[in-house]
Amino acid sequence: MIRKAKAVWRGTGRDGAGNLTTDSGVLDATPYSFKTRFENEKGTNPEELIAAAHAGCFTMALAFQLQAAGFTPTELSTEAAVTLEKDGAGFRISQSALTLRAQVPNLDEPAFARMAGDAEKNCPVSKVLNAKITLDAKLI
């Protein structure tokens, strides 16, 4: 399986702007720029997209683990907070902090913690990130 996205950029790093498009069409010339990345202007940025990918991948991985164990979650809600920090002359993603709140009937805390930890370690996005990954998982 191959998934594709395209970035188009015009101008300098600080003053230019670009757009992102995915083959699925979910992103269609979605704008991004220095200001959307570093100054909170409306638009997206690579780190936000990585956070969305990590949250979605982890949550689906956990849903599959729960299904295999015979559990059906009422709701799995995951937030990923990706940290971008200075690294020499450039920047690096140093961390992705996952916060999960899960409603899973009849699941005990030890089994939940084990499955959440396994999902964090084994989701494809976790595997591709060269960053510290933390998980705060609570069964509610």
Question: Which residue stretches match the model-derived regions?
Answer:
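Extended beta-strand/beta-hairpin segments
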Residues: 1-52, 59-140
